[in-house]
Amino acid sequence: MVYTKNDQKSINFLKVFDFWSFFVILKKMKGEITMKKVELNKKKKQDALLNTAYQLFTEKGFQKTSISDIVNEAGVAKGTFYLYFKDKLDIRYKLIAKKSAEVFKHAYQELQKQSIDHFEDQLIFIVDQVIGALNANPTLLKLISKHLSWGMFKNSLVEPIDDAQRNIYDIYMDLLNNSGHEFDHPEVMIYMIIEMVAGSCYNVILTGEPVSVDELKPYLYQSIRLIIQNHIL
């Protein structure tokens, strides 16, 4: 095939254009990779601070742990701490939210493996999984139980815990909507359940008083069922 001068110019232009397009795409990909590395590095530092705070809060206690203790143990500069947290109370708040989300995530994953159709049974299964996790880790219980309130449940546990990017509150509302029932003040209902579970299990798990966890469960779960039934319209 014979090319004219104009054909050759067009071919040369396309070669330059293709090379430039490839260069632009490559540069964009490099920028995206760099951004991902930056985000991963930021998350790594934040996780290091959270994990260190958890270790120190549970070993030394919240009051005896300083921000300097946390950053020194985590191996980051003090200024880095303030990039992620306002103060010591803020890191505890976020730490409780993170640990609580992990517990609920595991409970919900276990629920998905079961064939449980009724809302009451689904909620009690989740509660049972949460109690089991806290019973197996009293240190974690000490950190989150006294702070696992309705406000924490609704406003702080925003980290997605399933493939649909739903958080704990979203999942609770979906379970309600799929229950086949309408509920009177569902937020009041879950508030009462959370407060009852947190309050009644704390001393039972830590001291075994007035009964063991296994002895408490039937009474606790019956109370949960009654709360749910009283809210069905």
Predicted ranges, named:
Residues 1-60, 65-76, 90:
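Basic, helix-initiating cap at the start of DNA-binding domains
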Residues 75-85:
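Short hydrophobic/aromatic patch on the recognition helix
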Residues 92-102, 106, 144, 164:
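Alpha-helical DNA-contacting segments of helix-turn-helix folds
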Residues 132-170, 206:
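Short secondary-structure transition hinges
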Residues 177-223:
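Hydrophobic/aromatic-rich alpha-helical bundle segments in the mid-to-C-terminal region
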